[in-house]
Every structure is written in C-alpha cells, then in structure tokens.
Amino acid sequence: MTVLQYFNDLASRLNLTGSQIEGVNASRDRILTALQSSPKISLIDQKPCFYTGSYSRDTIIRPLDDIDLYIRIDYSKHADGKSPREIIMLFRQELKRTLPETPMKESPPCIKIKFFNKRFEVVPVVSYRDNDDLYDIPTSDLKGWEPCFPTLPNKWLTQANKRNGGLFIPLIKMVKQWIRNNGLRTPIKSFHIELLTDLIFSKYNIENYPQGIFIWFFAVNELFLFNKMPFVPEPEGNGYVDSYLFGKPFLLKRFRNKVSDGLKMTCDAINHGSKGQETVAVNLFRSLFGAL
C-alpha cells in the first residue's frame, strides 16, 4: 500500500456508512414523533427540526459521537411566557412518556438521549421569520434565551472545502481521528478544531492529504509558539473559540506537546515516503492516526 492509498482508505473509513445515516434519521424521527404527538407541545410545521454541529457539517467521524438536534418551537403558541427550564422539562416529560425504555437526562441547554451506538443532544430553539441564520437557544442556566447562528459554519465550511478541491472536510476528519487516538476527544472541542483548520488553510492550499496533514501540524505548532493568548476567533466575532484551552494550562501544554510529536512523526513519515520507503511511511502514519 502506498501513502496516498493509505490516506484514501483512511478518508473512506472515517465516513459514516449508509446504514449509520439511516439509523440516525430513524432515531431522529422517533424523537420528533414523540414531541409532535403531544398536545402540550407546538412546533413549527415546516422543518420542525434540523441537525447542527459536526453531524450537519459532515465532519463527524466513526464511531458516532453526539448528534446535535435543534427542535423549532412555535414561540407564540407554546413558548411565550414560559422559561426555557419549563420547556426543557416538558420536552423530557413527553419524550419519556413515548420512549420509556430509552435512557435520557437533562444537560442544560439540552436533553441527552441515548440510543444504541449513538446519543442525541436535543435543544429547543426559537427561529425568526426575517432571519434564516438567527436562532435563540436556552442559556446554560435555563433562565433565558441567547442568540446563536447554527447554520453559518456550514456555509464557510462548504466554501473552504470547495476552495481546497474537496480535501478540506476529509482532512478535518483525519485531524479529529488523530485527536481521538491521542485521548483528547473529550477535552478538545470539535468546533475549535474546525475553525483552527479553516484559519490554517485560508493561507495554504491542500494539494494532497500527506502534505495537508504536514501543513496542519507545522502551522499549529508555529501558532502556539507565537501566540500566548487565544487566537481562533468565533465566527460571529465575539470572543475566541479557543479561550477554554488557554484557560487550562495543563491541557494547553498537553495539546501543544501532542502537536509537536505529531509534527515530528509526520516529517519522519514524509521523509521515508520521499525515499520510496512507502511501507515504513504508511506504518508511521498508522501510528499517528491509530487503528480504525
């Protein structure tokens, strides 16, 4: 197997299968049916729910992690005068009534529902007729609402993927697999990685996967050397998405060290590949990304 063959195979293995996607949609339909069948809950008739997060952006990898599902409530009929806490409690009550054997718990601002091999995070949201991008979601204390723009990342991600010949999204998935292989999946936020990768490849082009992975490690290593403060801006321009990382010195140091190690291993693999030692190079990349 050549290095390029290995990366093409890796990209394929990280994608969800058709049966997994069908399973996700079937579970979504069970959630939606439970809510729509309740006379106590009023949802928007057209497009009552939609995926968001890494699942909607096609940057989720196998095995499945959390799937974010936004439920569009009819504010005038249902939510007006009710606090987000009341709505969350009502959602959970109706979901539990219809899906009594399905594990679920409140985890503000969402309800986490555990199905076989997947978990949903269900969030009630309020939409606006004059702005398709703007939604209100419950605050973490469930005392009020705050604005969010869940569809905007899909737009810049699509642009970045097109700009890089369709290699951008698969590369993000590879980086996420490297993070998972290094035990960093829980502490390192998925959206942070997507924005960080976009920041890098707004200045570089991805010619192929090995070159793209090298650029990612090299650029992130350089960014950490020259930035002692958060540097990945939020899409809406309010704050930085990597603030959490710089607020945890031990995690920051651990992540920086993993990036440095990844850069060294990638350089070693590429050097072996350039000498025609494809098997050695492939084995190094396998160590980098781990078994699937």
Predicted regions and their residues:
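Short, compositionally biased low-complexity segments
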Residues: 1-12, 62-72, 139-151, 229-235
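Generic detection of long, well-ordered alpha-helical segments
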Residues: 21-28, 81-85, 164-169, 210, ...
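Catalytic cores of NTP-dependent nucleotidyl/adenyl transfer enzymes across multiple folds
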Residues: 23, 29-32, 100, 105-233, ...
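Terminal (often C-terminal) interaction modules
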Residues: 1-8, 36, 80, 231-292
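Histidine/cysteine- and/or acidic
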Residues: 22-25, 41, 51, 63-77, ...
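N-terminal regions immediately upstream of nucleotidyltransferase
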Residues: 1-64, 75-83
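Short, solvent-exposed polar/charged micro-motifs at secondary-structure junctions
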Residues: 56-62, 113-115, 242
